[in-house]
């Protein structure tokens, strides 16, 4: 580091807590002109399991996050995200623009603009999404859980009396290679005033 730039690196060589087995995982970053550029990596020996590059900008009480689409890797595979993706978070405000991760027919979207929602919300929408895509980070050699996720999970009114609405199916659900069939989550808040 000097008076203008700050660079850092932190990571682990290996962490084993059965069935979790993290291999070489590290975070590198550099701060320049109030912009923090982060590079998160996880490797299984020589294979890149996970790679996410992003930039964070702090402006007063607001945090802006952008995920770089170049070399976005989840579960050893290249993924796509729109170049103009943007996440803005403040004390009582969040906005997720074009935060849509996709690969072939798999999609995961985080949004604050789900059409059927009438109150402030933050939602995660799944389409043909394989659970192992994220869980491979915790054990790249053995599937902790598998299944195809469809549906949505929404946090309602996240800055006050928070509630939730969820309609998720996980088809062909397995945990540690044990088949469990279909898992369904269908939940909604009775009244937002019951929370808080």
Where are these predicted regions, by residue range?
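Interface amphipathic segments
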Residues: 1-196
